[in-house]
Regions:
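Positively charged n-region of N-terminal signal peptides that target proteins for export
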Residues: 1-5
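Surface-exposed extracellular loop regions of Gram-negative outer-membrane beta-barrel proteins
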Residues: 94-105
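Signature for the C-terminal beta-barrel architecture of outer-membrane proteins
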Residues: 19-40, 48-72, 82-85, 103, ...
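Phosphate/ribose-recognition catalytic cores of enzymes acting on nucleotide-derived substrates
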Residues: 76
C-alpha cells in the first residue's frame, strides 16, 4: 500500500521547511505459559506536528500477538490539518458521536477489537455549531466456530463495511441538540448459502439519531433516540424456476 509510504515521506519532509516537533512511545509485551500460550508484541507510536499539520504513525511487530493476526510493519497512520474552524483528517480515524450510541470507534488490542475507519474526515466548528462528515472503509475481524478455520486467538472471518456519516451539533447557552446519520454497506459473510457453500450477503444499514443534552446547576440530562433499518442490497438477480435468486 503506497499511502503509508507517502505518509512517512510527508512526516520527514515537513521538517525540511520548518520547525518539526516529534514525540513517541514504545510498548513491549511478552508472555509464556505451559499450555503454549506465548506471545511477543512491540508497538511503536510516532507523533509529529508542524504548525497546523499533525501526523500519527503506529508500527507493530508481533510474533505472535496475544490476540489477532501477526503484523510486522506499519499498522496505523493518520494525517491531520487543523484550521481555526475546520479540520481535515486522512487515514485511520476513530470517532465518538454523542455518548457513542450510534458511533463509538476504538482500538482495544487487549481484546483484539478495532472498529476504526480508514478514510477521510471533515469537521467544521464554531462556538455554537459543529458539523462532521466521515467516509471510508472498515474491516472488523471476528472469530466463530461456525466458520472453517476457527482459532480462539486468530480471527477466521471479516466483515467489510463502506461507511458514510454526518453528525450535526447545535449548542445553546445551557443545552445542545444533535443529529446523526450513518450508512454502512456491508459484505457480511455467511457460513453456508442455499448450495451449502460459504457466501457473502450484501447488506445496507442506515442509522439515524436525535439527541439533546441539558446542563443545569443542579442536574444534567441526556436523551437520545436512535432508529436503524437493514435491508439486503440486490445487485443482480437470476430467474430460477418459478421465482428468482440473488446472484
Amino acid at each position: 500500500m503506497r499511502f503509508w509510504f507517502f505518509g512517512i515521506l510527508f512526516t520527514w519532509g515537513i521538517g525540511l521547511f520548518g520547525q518539526l516537533s516529534t514525540t513517541g512511545d514504545v510498548q513491549l509485551r511478552w508472555g509464556e505459559s505451559k499450555n503454549h500460550f506465548n506471545y511477543t508484541e512491540t508497538l511503536l507510536n510516532l507523533n509529529a506536528n508542524w504548525g497546523r499539520t499533525f501526523s500519527w504513525l503506529q508500527f507493530e511487530f508481533s510474533d505472535p500477538p496475544e490476540l489477532g493476526k501477526r503484523i510486522s510493519g506499519l499498522r496505523k497512520i493518520r494525517i491531520e490539518y487543523r484550521g481555526e474552524r475546520t479540520q481535515i483528517e486522512v487515514g485511520d480515524l476513530y470517532k465518538i458521536w454523542g455518548r457513542g450510541l450510534i458511533l463509538n470507534q476504538l482500538d482495544d488490542q487487549a481484546i483484539d477489537l478495532d472498529n476504526g475507519l480508514t478514510g477521510v474526515g471533515f469537521t467544521y466548528q464554531t462556538k455554537r455549531f459543529q458539523g462532521q462528515i466521515i467516509a471510508g472503509n472498515q474491516d472488523i475481524y471476528k472469530s466463530t466456530n461456525l466458520v472453517l478455520g476457527f482459532n480462539d486467538r486468530i480471527p477466521n472471518y471479516t466483515m467489510h463495511h463502506s461507511l458514510f456519516g454526518v453528525d450535526l451539533l447545535k449548542h445553546f447557552p445551557s443545552s445542545s441538540l444533535g443529529y446523526s446519520f450513518l450508512q454502512s454497506r456491508e459484505r457480511h459473510p455467511i457460513p453456508f448459502n442455499q448450495y451449502y457453500q460459504p457466501d457473502t450477503l450484501p447488506l445496507v444499514h442506515r442509522l439515524q439519531s436525535l439527541r439533546i443534552e441539558m446542563i443545569k446547576s443542579r442536574f444534567d440530562t441526556y436523551l437520545e433516540y436512535v432508529t436503524k433499518t437493514t435491508h439486503e442490497s440486490y445487485q443482480s438477480v437470476d430467474f430460477f424456476g418459478t421465482g428468482f435468486t440473488r446472484k
